Amino acid sequence: MENINTLRETLNQGQKSLSKENIEDLLKDMPRHNSFRYINQGSLTDEYFRFARQTLDDLHVYIVISNTGSPAGEVISLFTKKQYNHASLSFDRNLKTIISYNGGERIYPPGLNMETVKYFNKKRDSSIMAYSIPISSEKKKAVIDTISEINKEGNAYNLIGLVLKFSFSQT
């Protein structure tokens, strides 16, 4: 009986995720979600990195795992079979420095961008978990420096690569 209930839940989730509205939204937005070149150079500003470095006395980083209920997130859930499919990183407790690889709310170019916290609960069935992880000031600085390098080098966000777990990026 438990297997039947699990199958029923999976089918219901699939029906919701693959609804006509979700598919239309994904197809319409597909060009924005599939960058095969590093197009997102410098999306994080010098001001962002100044603020991030001001947090070095806070010996934590903050990880936010979310289920925003977006069409892309719902389809990703079909493949991962996980409720939470998006991760964000912040250097401060108030999430002023929160970033992730995202296409966000019509962000272009998609890639490494600041998150817009208000969109985490845009849909009624959205949910988040936030973690505070201890880190030394030196390691936190190294993380900020690594993100700064990625930001300078450029990056791409590719939904197909995310689902297939294969990087399609080209420099």
Question: Residue ranges of each PLM-predicted region?
Answer:
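Cysteine-nucleophile amide-bond enzymes
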Residues: M1-T171
